[in-house]
C-alpha cells in the first residue's frame, strides 16, 4: 500500500502537465568535450568558453556553435570571470608560463599580459583578485611548481599588483624566504564589495605573509608573520605596528569589519587565538570571547543584516581518515563586533557539528543544524544510530528565538514516519549545505532533508522540500535528492536528481517549475548524465538561463554541458503590476526595528519578472515601539539562563567603567540598543548598581587575570586532562555519575549527555593521549579519540562489569582488552569468573579471548626487542582455585597458548620490562624479569643483614636501563619500611641504594625522581628503624636526596631563614641534626601530585619543616627549590597546594585544608609573591591542577563553599595570559636568544654523570614561554673523565663508610659467566671488579673502577677463546733462533779476533786506553779492537760507581743508628696495612682500593721481585709520603699489594 502511494505521488508531481506552460519547452543545447570538465559563462549572456587540449574555444549562441580563439596560443590552466564585471571581463591563465589573457568585451577580443616572475618554474597556477570599483586595479597570485624526481615540487607563491598590466609590482615580506618558501602569502583589497563601509581609499590592500619553521628534533614549530597595508594600490607597503611582535595566522575582510587572527603561542600552531576587530583598518581591538578560540573556519565567517559577525569555530581533526565532520561552535558578536557569545539553541549544551546558514537577502533570518558527536555501534554497521538527537531550527529575529522547521503537507502526510502536526517532535531535519549558494528570492528556497524527531538521520531517505515563506514551513516536492537552482527570483526552478530511481540509474531528464514549485514539468535529455553542477547564468539568480554539466555513462566518459534557456516562456511576457503580491518577511514581525515587505510575483502569474534582485521592491516600515529584541546586553553584561542581562565581572574588569568611577560603585544600563536598529521609541532601561571595590584598578596586574566560576550541585570526584598540546581538554565526573567535558581548562564546561545512563568509571589510554573510555551503568562504553569532541557508543559484551581496568596496545589505538564477568548473577557465586574480551576496532566488535583472565598485557608492543610483536601475556585465575598462573600467546590464544609460570602472585610492566612475582618456599616471594617476553631471569637481590624473607616489594619504575625496587624489610602496619634497590641494565641483578626507606601499608613508597633532571631522587627514611622494628618507638622520618642516581645520599640543606626573615630553631653544622624534611608520596591525597615538574626544570615544592625529624603535616610550611634540590627557601607558612604553569614561569600556591578566597602567585621563579583574590566568598580548595605538561597559563581550582546550599561545589579557572606583555623570543639557531640564557643548576658547575649540562632559563619575567620545549634544548657542555661519582657498587658488594665498595662477608661476586647465557655470541667474560658504571653516566677515561681483569672463556667456547688469544709459536721461534745465531756469531767473532789472540781475559785489566799492544793487521781488526775498548771502559765506570754508592750508604746508616738509637718505626706500607686494611681476602680486595684503578694498565705490569723487602723497610717514610699520589679521601691498598705499590712508586721516581 505504501509503495502504491509513493508511486502515486511521483505520478502526481512528475506526470501532470503544466497548465500555465502547456506548450512550452525550454531551449536546450548540448556541448560534448573530452578534455574539459567545466565551461565558463558570462553573466546574462549566451557566451560560453571552454578549453580543449591545445586550444580555447568560444560560443556566442549557448554552445550551438564553437570557434577557436586565435589570440590565445598556449594551453590554458584556468578561467576566471570578474565577479564585479561578469557580463564582460574574464581572465585566462596559461599553465606553462607566467602569462594570462584578458577580455573586456565578453570574449570577442583578448590581450596578453606577462607576469615578471622572479623564479623559474615548470608550472604556474595563478589567479586574480579584482577591485569592485576601480577596474584597472588587479592582484595576481601565482603558485610556482617545478618538476623533480618525476613529480611536481612546490617552489613558492609570488604576489603582484598591477594597473591593468601596464606595470607590475611584486609584494614581498621583509623577512624574506625561510626553508625554501613562505607558507602563507595572501593579498586582498580592503574594499571587498561595492557597498563596503571600509576602504576610504579605494586602493587600499592588505597582505599577510607567514612562515612556519618545523623543528625536527622536537616536533614543534616556530611561526613568523608580517601583516602589511598599502594605501596607494600596492606601490608601497607599511607593516601594521599593532601586529609587529605577534604571529598573524589569518585575516578576513567583510563588509563592515576586518578580522585578524593572531596566534597566542608562536611555537604551537594549535594554540589559542586572539580575534582582532577593526572597522577602519587603522585601529584594532581584541574581541571578547567566552573562552579561548583555537580553530576558526575563516571561509565561513560572515556578517548578518545588522553587521554582527558570525564566527564558526571548529576543532582540528586528529584522524584525517575520520568520516565524522569536525566539531564546531558558532559565536555571534554584538553589533559593535567586540563581544562574542555562542548561539543559544544547542540542545543540552552538547558537543557536535553546528552549521549555520544566513541567506543575506532575508534580513534577520538564520538557519541552524546540530549534528551530535555521539554515535552508536551495533557491531554490524558503524554509526548506525545516534543517542543524542539532531536538531534543525530557523530564526527570523536575528537568532533571538528559534523554532523547528514545520512541514505543512497534507497530501504527503502518510509518507512521513511521525506526526507533522506536532513540529516539536516531528519536523524537517537538514544540514543546510545547500543554502550556501542559494540564489536570492523573496522567500522561495529548496532544501534536502528528512522528516523525523532527529533521533536518526539516514542519508538514503533524504528528499527534496520547498518553502515559500523563508523557511518557516516546508512542503515535499521530490522523493529524491539532486541538484537544484532558481531563476527569475524563484519563479523558475530547475531540479535534476542524482539518481533517476532506486536502482541508481543515471538520470536522463530534468524537472522544472514555473509556478514556484506548485507543479512540475520534465524534459528528456538527449544523453543521460551524471550531474555535477547546475547554476544560473546570472549570479543573483534573476536570469532565465542555466548551465548543467556532468559526464556521460559511456565506457570512455565524455564531458557534457547542457545550456538551458527559459527566456521564451510565457511568450517572453514580462510581469505587470497586477502580477505582484506583497510578501511579509518574518511573518510580518519587526526585524531590526522595522517591518519588511517584498513585492513578488504571484504564484500562478503567467509572466517573468526579468529584474535583478537588487531592483526588487523592498518596503521598510520602522516599528513604533522598541522591544527587547531591539536590544542587546551592554558590554559588561551577559544573558543568564532566563535571558536576563546580568553583570559579568570579568567583562567589568576589562572595561574602564570602574576606573572612571570616583565612588565605590557605578550605575550601568544592562541593555543597549542594537547598532543600526530602526525602532522609534526606546524602552526605559533601569541602571544597575555595580560595586567597584573588588574590581582591580587600571595598571594593576590583577586587572589582567581572568577568573571563571562554574557551580555544581554534586562534588566532582574525578578529573583528568588529555595530555596534548592541541588544547586544554579534560573530563570530570561527579559523585552521582554525571560526566562533564571542557576544552579550555574548565572555563566552559558542558555536561556529557548519556541519555540517562550514569558513568561509573573513566579510563584514559596511556599510549594515545587523545583517547578516553567512559563506562556506563547500562553496559555501554563511550569512546573518544579526539579529546572528548566526539564519542562512539559501543555495547559491552553480555557480561557483568567487574570494574577492572582496560588493557591497551601500545601501538594500535583501537585495540584493547575488556574484562567482564560470566555466570555472575551474584558476584559471590563460585561460578562467577572473569573473561578477557578483545577488540581491534575500537569497541565495535568484541571477541572472547581468554577465560579466567584477570590481567593481560600486549607484551609485544612494550619491549624494545620483543621475541614476537603479537605476544600477549595474561594472568589467569582458575575457578575454584586461588592459584594464579602466567600464560602467553602470539595469536591471541586462538591456537597458541604457553604457560610461563604455574603459580604467581602477580606481574606488571615498566619501562620495557615485565616483572613477575612468584611465590617461594617459606611464604617468600621471588621476582623474575624479562625484556623480550621469551626468557625470564630471576632477579638477584643483594644479601643484607636487615633483609629477611622477601615478603613484599614495590616496583618504583625504570629509567635509563635500570629498575628501581623497594624491598620491604618491616611490614608491621603503620611502621612499614624497607630497602631501596636498583638493578643492572637487564633488570636481573640488584644492589642496595638506601636502607629503611619509608612505605605505607598499600605499598606506596616515599620515593620520587625529580622530573626532567638526571639522577636526582628524594626519599624519606626511617631514622630509628631498629627501635621501630622492635616496637619501641614510632617512626621518625628524615628526607634524603641523591644527585647521582642513588650512589650517594645526603640530607637536604635547610634555608638559613624562614619566610618571615627569622632564623630556624636549629642551627647545627651537622645535617643529621638540622636539615629540611618533606612529606612524601605516601601521604598524598592525589598520587598524581609531585614535588617537581618535567617542564619547570630544577623546581620543586614540598611541605615540611627544618629540624632533626619530620613533623606532622599541619605543623609544616611550604618550601621551594629552583636548583634541583641543592638549596631551599621557605615561601609560605603552613601547608599549601602548588601548581606549575608556563614551564615554571607562573607558580601558584593555595592554602591546604583551610578556607580561602585568594591564591598566591609568582612570575619570577619564586623570588617574590603576590596575592590574587579569585572569589567573593571563602571556599575550601580541594585541589589545583593544570595541563600535565605544566605549560599552560590557566589553572583550575576545585572548591567547596560550606553552608551555601545548592551549587556549593565550584570550579575556578584562573587565566594569567594577560599579565604578560609578550611571548619570549627564542631563536632555534642560537644566533639570538635575548630572553633565554644557558646556565647550570645551582652551584653544581662541575660534572654530573660524566658531563657538564646547562639548561635554558628565561631572563625576562614580563614575557611568557609558551610551547617552547626548553627541556629539549638543554646542552652538554662537555664529557668529563670518570670519577668515583660515576660508579656504584656491583651485585653482592656494599658501600662502606669510607666510600669503597666491599664484598659482603661470606658471599662471592656475581658469576660473570651468566652474561654468556644472555648473549650466546660472546666467547669470553670478565670477573666483577666490585664496581659498575652508573647507566646515566657518559664519562670517558679517567678512573676505571669497573676495569675488567683477565678474561675467561665462556662455557663451550674454550676453543674459540684459545684461537683468539693463541700465539703463532713457529714464526716467533724462527725469528728468535735467527737473532740468537746472529748474536752468537758476533760475540764469537769479537772474542776470537779481539780478545783470544790478544792474550785472553788475563790481559783484560792490563789493557789501557791508547795502548798499542793490540794486534791490528787490517780494518776488521781495528773495528773489533774499538768494540773491545768500549766494553772495557763501560765496565770500569760501572764498577767504580757501585763502590762509591756502597760506601755512602754505609756511612748514612751509621749516622741514623747513632741518632735514633736503632729504634725502628713503621714504614708507610705497614701503617696503611695496620690502619686501613680491609677484612676480605683474595682477589676482591682490589675493589676496596681506588688507586689500583688509576692507570690504564693492569697489575701484571708491576714486577714485585725487583724490590727487596729489606730495602722497603729501610726506605724513608717521609720520601714515600711525598711521592704518594693517593688522595686523602681514598684508602690505600691492602697488605697483599704493598710491595706492588712501593715498586710502582719507586719506578715513578
Swiss-Prot record:
Topological category with respect to the lipid bilayer: Single-pass type I membrane protein
Q: Give residue ranges of the BNR repeats.
A: 57-68, 101-112, 159-170, 228-239, 393-404, 465-476, 511-522, 740-751, 837-848, 1040-1051, 1119-1130, 1160-1171
Basic and acidic residues composition bias: residue spans: 1535-1549
Instruction: Report the domain of life of the source organism.
Output: Eukaryota
Which GO CC annotations does the UniProt entry carry? Answer: cytosol; fungal-type vacuole; Golgi apparatus; membrane
Q: Where is composition skewed (Polar residues) in this entry?
A: 1489-1501
- Name where it's found: Golgi apparatus, trans-Golgi network membrane
Query: Which SMART domains does UniProt cross-reference here?
Result: VPS10
Q: Which GO terms describe its molecular function?
A: nucleotide binding; signal sequence binding
Xref: SUPFAM superfamilies? Oligoxyloglucan reducing end-specific cellobiohydrolase, Sialidases
Residues of this chain annotated as glycosylated in UniProt: 479, 769, 986
Signal peptide location: 1-21
What Pfam families does this protein map onto? Sortilin-Vps10, Sortilin_C
Which residue stretches are annotated as topological domain Lumenal? 22-1369
Positions of region (Disordered): 1479-1549
Q: Which residues lie on this side of the membrane: Cytoplasmic?
A: 1391-1549
Q: Which GO terms describe its biological process?
A: Golgi to endosome transport; Golgi to vacuole transport; protein targeting to vacuole
Q: InterPro entries per the record?
A: Sialidase_sf, Sortilin_C, Sortilin_N, VPS10, VPS10-sortilin, WD40/YVTN_repeat-like_dom_sf
Keywords attached to this Swiss-Prot or TrEMBL record, sorted alphabetically, are: Glycoprotein, Golgi apparatus, Membrane, Nucleotide-binding, Protein transport, Receptor, Repeat, Signal, Transmembrane, Transmembrane helix, Transport
For this protein, the parts annotated as crossing the membrane are 1370-1390
**Further details from the record:** Present with 279 molecules/cell in log phase SD medium.
Functionally, this protein is described as follows: Functions as a sorting receptor in the Golgi compartment required for the intracellular sorting and delivery of soluble vacuolar proteins, like carboxypeptidase Y (CPY) and proteinase A.
User: What family is this?
Assistant: Belongs to the VPS10-related sortilin family.
Official protein name in the record: VPS10 homolog 2
The species is Saccharomyces cerevisiae (strain ATCC 204508 / S288c) (Baker's yeast)
Amino acid at each position: 500500500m505504501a509503495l502504491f502511494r509513493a508511486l502515486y505521488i511521483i505520478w502526481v508531481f512528475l506526470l501532470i502537465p503544466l497548465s500555465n506552460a502547456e506548450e512550452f519547452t525550454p531551449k536546450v543545447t548540448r556541448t560534448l568535450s573530452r578534455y574539459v570538465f567545466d565551461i565558463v559563462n558570462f553573466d546574462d549572456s549566451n557566451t560560453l568558453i571552454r578549453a580543449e587540449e591545445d586550444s580555447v574555444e568560444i560560443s556566442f549562441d549557448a554552445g550551438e556553435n564553437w570557434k577557436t580563439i586565435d589570440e590565445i596560443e598556449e594551453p590554458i590552466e584556468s578561467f576566471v570571470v570578474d565577479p564585479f564585471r561578469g557580463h564582460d571581463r574574464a581572465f585566462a591563465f596559461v599553465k606553462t608560463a607566467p602569462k594570462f589573457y584578458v577580455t573586456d568585451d565578453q570574449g570577442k577580443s583578448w590581450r596578453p599580459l606577462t607576469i615578471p616572475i622572479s623564479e623559474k618554474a615548470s608550472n604556474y597556477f595563478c589567479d586574480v583578485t579584482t577591485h569592485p570599483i576601480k577596474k584597472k586595479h588587479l592582484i595576481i597570485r601565482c603558485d610556482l611548481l617545478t618538476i623533480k624526481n618525476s613529480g611536481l615540487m612546490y617552489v613558492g607563491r609570488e604576489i603582484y599588483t598591477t594597473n591593468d598590466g601596464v606595470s607590475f609590482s611584486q609584494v614581498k615580506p621583509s623577512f624574506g624566504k625561510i626553508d625554501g618558501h613562505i607558507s602563507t602569502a595572501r593579498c586582498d583589497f580592503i574594499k571587498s564589495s561595492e557597498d563596503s563601509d571600509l576602504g576610504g581609499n579605494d586602493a587600499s590592500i592588505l597582505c599577510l605573509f607567514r612562515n612556519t619553521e618545523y623543528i625536527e628534533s622536537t616536533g614543534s614549530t616556530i611561526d613568523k608573520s608580517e601583516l602589511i597595508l598599502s594605501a596607494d594600490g600596492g606601490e608601497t607597503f607599511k607593516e601594521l605596528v599593532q601586529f609587529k611582535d605577534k604571529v598573524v595566522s589569518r585575516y578576513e575582510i567583510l563588509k563592515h569589519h576586518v578580522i585578524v587572527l593572531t596566534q597566542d603561542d608562536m611555537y604551537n600552531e594549535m594554540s589559542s587565538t586572539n580575534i582582532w576587530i577593526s572597522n577602519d583598518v587603522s585601529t584594532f581591538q581584541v574581541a571578547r570571547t567566552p573562552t579561548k578560540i583555537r580553530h576558526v573556519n575563516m571561509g565561513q565567517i560572515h556578517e548578518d543584516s545588522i553587521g554582527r559577525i558570525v564566527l564558526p569555530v571548529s576543532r582540528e581533526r586528529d584522524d584525517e581518515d575520520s568520516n565524522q565532520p569536525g566539531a564546531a561552535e558558532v559565536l555571534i558578536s554584538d553589533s559593535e563586533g567586540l563581544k562574542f557569545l555562542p548561539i543559544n539553541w544547542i540542545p543540552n549544551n552538547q558537543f557536535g557539528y553546528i552549521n549555520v546558514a544566513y541567506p543575506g537577502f532575508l534580513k534577520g533570518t538564520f538557519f541552524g543544524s546540530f549534528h551530535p558527536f555521539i554515535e552508536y555501534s551495533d557491531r554490524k554497521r558503524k554509526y548506525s544510530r545516534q543517542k543524542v538527537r539532531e536538531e534543525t531550527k530557523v530564526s527570523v529575529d536575528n537568532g533571538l528565538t528559534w523554532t523547528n522547521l514545520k512541514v505543512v503537507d497534507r497530501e504527503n502526510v502518510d509518507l512521513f514516519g511521525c506526526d507533522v502536526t506536532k513540529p516539536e517532535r516531528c519536523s524537517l531535519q537538514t544540514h543546510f549545505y545547500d543554502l550556501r549558494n542559494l540564489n536570492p528570492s523573496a522567500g522561495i528556497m529548496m532544501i534536502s532533508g528528512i522528516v523525523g524527531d532527529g533521533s536518526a538521520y539516514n542519508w538514503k531517505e533524504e528528499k527534496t522540500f520547498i518553502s515559500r515563506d523563508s523557511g518557516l514551513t516546508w512542503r515535499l516536492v521530490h522523493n529524491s535528492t539532486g541538484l537544484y537552482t532558481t531563476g527569475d527570483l524563484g519563479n523558475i526552478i530547475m531540479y535534476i536528481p542524482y539518481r533517476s530511481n532506486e536502482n541508481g540509474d543515471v538520470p536522463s531528464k530534468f524537472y522544472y517549475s514555473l509556478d514556484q514549485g506548485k507543479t512540475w514539468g520534465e524534459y528528456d535529455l538527449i544523453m543521460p548524465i551524471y550531474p555535477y553542477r547546475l547554476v544560473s547564468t546570472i549570479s543573483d539568480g534573476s536570469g532565465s538561463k542555466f548551465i548543467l554539466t556532468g559526464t556521460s555513462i559511456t565506457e570512455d566518459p565524455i564531458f557534457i554541458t547542457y545550456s538551458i534557456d527559459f527566456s521564451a516562456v510565457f511568450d517572453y511576457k514580462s510581469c505587470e503590476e497586477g502580477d505582484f503580491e506583497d510578501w511579509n518577511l518574518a511573518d510580518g514581525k519587526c526585524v531590526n526595528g522595522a517591518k519588511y515587505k517584498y513585492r513578488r510575483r504571484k504564484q500562478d502569474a503567467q509572466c517573468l519578472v526579468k529584474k535583478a534582485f537588487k531592483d526588487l521592491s523592498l518596503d521598510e516600515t520602522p516599528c513604533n515601539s522598541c522591544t527587547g529584541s531591539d536590544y542587546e546586553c551592554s558590554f559588561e553584561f551577559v544573558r543568564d539562563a532566563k535571558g536576563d542581562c546580568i553583570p559579568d565581572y570579568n567583562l567589568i574588569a576589562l572595561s574602564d567603567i570602574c576606573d572612571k568611577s570616583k565612588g565605590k560603585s557605578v550605575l550601568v544600563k544592562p541593555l543597549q540598543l542594537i547598532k543600526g536598529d530602526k525602532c522609534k521609541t526606546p524602552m526605559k532601561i533601569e541602571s544597575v548598581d555595580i560595586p567597584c571595590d573588588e574590581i582591580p584598578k587600571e595598571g594593576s596586574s590583577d586587572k589582567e587575570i581572568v577568573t571563571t566560576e562554574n557551580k555544581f550541585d554534586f562534588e566532582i570526584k574525578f578529573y583528568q586532562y588529555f595530555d596534548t598540546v592541541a588544547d586544554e581538554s579534560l573530563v570530570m565526573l561527579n559523585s552521582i555519575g554525571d560526566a562533564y567535558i571542557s576544552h579550555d581548562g574548565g572555563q566552559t564546561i558542558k555536561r556529557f549527555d548519556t541519555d540517562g545512563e550514569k558513568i561509573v568509571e573513566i579510563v584514559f589510554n596511556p599510549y594515545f593521549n587523545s583517547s578516553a573510555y567512559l563506562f556506563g551503568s547500562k553496559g555501554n562504553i563511550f569512546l573518544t579519540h579526539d579529546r572528548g569532541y566526539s564519542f562512539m557508543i559501543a555495547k559491552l559484551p553480555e557480561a557483568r562489569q567487574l570494574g577492572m581496568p582496560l588493557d591497551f596496545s601500545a601501538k594500535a589505538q583501537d585495540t584493547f582488552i575488556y574484562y567482564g564477568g560470566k555466570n555472575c548473577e551474584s558476584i559471590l557465586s563460585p561460578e562467577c569468573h572473569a573473561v578477557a574480551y578483545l577488540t581491534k576496532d575500537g569497541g565495535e566488535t568484541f571477541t572472547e579471548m581468554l577465560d579466567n583472565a584477570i590481567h593481560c598485557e600486549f607484551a609485544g608492543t612494550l619491549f624494545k626487542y620483543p621475541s614476537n610483536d603479537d605476544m600477549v601475556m595474561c594472568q589467569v585465575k582458575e575457578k575454584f582455585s586461588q592459584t594464579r598462573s602466567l600464560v602467553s600467546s602470539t595469536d591471541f590464544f586462538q591456537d597458541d597458548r604457553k604457560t610461563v609460570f604455574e603459580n604467581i602472585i602477580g606481574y606488571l610492566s615498566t619501562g620495557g620490562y615485565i616483572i613477575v612475582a612468584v611465590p617461594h618456599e617459606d611464604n617468600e616471594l621471588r621476582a623474575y624479569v624479562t625484556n623480550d617476553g621469551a626468557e625470564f631471569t630471576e632477579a638477584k637481590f643483594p644479601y643484607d643483614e636487615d633483609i629477611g624473607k622477601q615478603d613484599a616489594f614495590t616496583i618504583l619504575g625504570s629509567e635509563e636501563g635500570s629498575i628501581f625496587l623497594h624491598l620491604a624489610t618491616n611490614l608491621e602496619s603503620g611502621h612499614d619500611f624497607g630497602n631501596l634497590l636498583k638493578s643492572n641494565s637487564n633488570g636481573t641483578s640488584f644492589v642496595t641504594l638506601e636502607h629503611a626507606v619509608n612505605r605505607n601499608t598499600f605499598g606506596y613508597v616515599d620515593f620520587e625522581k625529580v622530573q626532567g633532571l638526571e639522577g636526582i631522587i628524594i626519599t624519606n627514611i626511617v631514622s630509628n628503624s631498629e627501635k621501630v622494628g622492635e616496637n619501641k618507638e614510632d617512626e621518625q622520618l628524615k628526607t634524603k636526596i641523591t644527585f647521582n642516581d642513588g650512589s650517594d645520599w645526603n640530607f637536604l640543606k635547610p634555608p638559613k631563614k624562614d619566610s618571615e626573615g627569622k632564623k630556624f630553631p636549629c642551627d647545627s653544622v651537622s645535617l643529621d641534626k638540622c636539615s629540611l624534611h618533606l612529606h612524601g608520596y605516601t601521604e598524598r591525597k592525589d598520587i598524581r601530585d609531585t614535588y617537581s615538574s618535567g617542564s619547570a626544570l630544577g623546581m620543586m615544592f614540598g611541605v615540611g619543616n627544618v629540624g632533626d625529624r619530620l613533623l606532622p603535616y599541619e605543623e609544616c610550611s611550604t618550601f621551594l627549590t629552583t636548583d634541583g634540590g641543592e638549596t631551599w627557601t621557605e615561601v609560605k607558612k603552613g601547608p599549601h597546594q602548588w601548581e606549575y604553569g608556563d614551564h615554571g614561569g607562573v607558580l601558584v600556591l593555595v592554602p591546604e585544608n583551610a578556607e580561602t578566597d585568594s591564591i598566591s602567585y609568582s612570575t619570577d621563579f619564586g623570588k617574590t609573591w603576590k596575592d590574587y583574590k579569585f572569589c567573593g566568598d571563602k571556599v575550601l580548595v580541594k585541589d589545583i591542577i593544570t595541563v600535565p605538561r605544566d605549560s599552560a597559563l590557566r589553572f583550575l581550582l576545585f572548591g567547596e563553599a560550606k553552608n551555601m546550599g545548592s551549587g556549593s561545589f565550584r570550579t575556578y579557572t584562573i587565566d594569567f595570559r594577560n599579565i604578560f606583555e609578550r611571548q619570549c623570543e627564542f631563536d632555534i639557531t642560537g644566533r639570538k636568544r635575548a630572553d633565554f640564557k644557558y646556565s647550570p643548576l645551582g652551584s653544581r658547575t662541575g660534572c654530573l654523570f660524566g658531563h657538564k649540562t646547562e639548561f635554558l632559563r628565561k631572563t625576562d619575567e614580563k614575557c611568557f614561554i609558551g610551547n617552547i620545549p626548553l627541556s629539549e634544548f638543554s646542552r652538554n657542555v662537555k664529557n668529563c673523565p670518570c670519577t668515583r661519582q660515576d660508579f656504584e657498587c656491583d651485585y653482592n658488594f656494599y658501600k662502606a663508610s669510607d666510600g669503597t665498595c666491599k664484598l659482603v662477608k661470606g658471599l662471592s661476586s656475581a658469576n660473570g659467566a651468566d652474561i654468556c647465557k644472555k648473549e650466546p655470541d660472546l666467547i669470553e667474560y670478565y670477573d666483577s671488579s666490585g664496581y659498575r658504571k652508573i647507566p646515566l653516566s657518559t664519562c670517558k677515561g679517567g678512573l676505571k673502577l669497573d676495569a675488567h681483569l683477565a678474561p675467561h672463556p665462556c662455557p663451550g667456547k674454550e676453543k674459540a677463546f684459545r684461537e683468539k688469544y693463541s700465539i703463532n709459536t713457529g714464526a716467533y721461534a724462527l725469528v728468535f733462533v735467527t737473532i740468537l745465531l746472529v748474536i752468537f756469531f758476533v760475540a764469537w767473532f769479537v772474542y776470537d779476533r779481539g780478545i783470544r789472540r790478544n792474550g785472553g781475559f788475563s790481559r783484560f785489566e792490563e789493557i789501557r786506553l791508547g795502548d798499542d799492544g793490540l794486534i791490528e793487521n787490517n780494518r776488521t781488526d781495528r773495528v773489533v779492537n774499538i768494540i773491545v775498548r768500549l766494553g772495557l771502559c763501560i765496565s770500569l765506570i760501572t764498577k767504580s760507581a757501585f763502590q762509591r754508592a756502597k760506601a755512602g750508604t754505609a756511612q748514612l746508616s751509621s749516622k741514623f743508628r747513632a741518632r735514633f738509637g736503632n729504634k725502628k718505626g713503621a714504614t708507610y706500607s705497614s701503617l696503611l696495612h695496620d690502619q686501613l686494611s680491609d677484612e676480605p681476602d683474595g682477589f676482591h680486595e682490589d675493589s676496596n682500593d681506588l688507586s689500583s684503578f688509576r692507570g690504564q694498565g693492569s697489575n701484571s705490569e708491576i714486577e714485585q721481585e725487583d724490590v727487596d723487602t729489606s730495602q722497603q723497610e729501610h726506605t724513608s717514610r717521609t720520601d714515600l709520603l711525598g711521592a704518594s699520589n693517593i688522595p686523602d679521601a681514598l684508602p690505600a691498598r691492602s697488605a697483599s699489594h704493598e710491595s706492588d705499590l712501593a715498586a710502582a712508586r719507586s719506578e715513578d721516581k
